[in-house]
């Protein structure tokens, strides 16, 4: 799975921040929920429009962004 298939940016949604499949849920939102201790199951229960692959895409997006920051790309 390529995260680019699930993570998009749209100028009119959430200020152009990376969002999941055109929904109004940002990558940051999902990462923040995980960092606060929510499990994937809790997130999926609270946001039934999300899929497990969406959460994995958020993690892949964050890893790719970190890799680019470290490498200076």
Language model regions located:
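Basic, low-complexity segments
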Residues: 1-15
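Conserved phosphate-binding loops in nucleotide/dinucleotide-binding enzymes
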Residues: 19
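Long, charge-rich, low-complexity alpha-helical segments
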Residues: 26-73
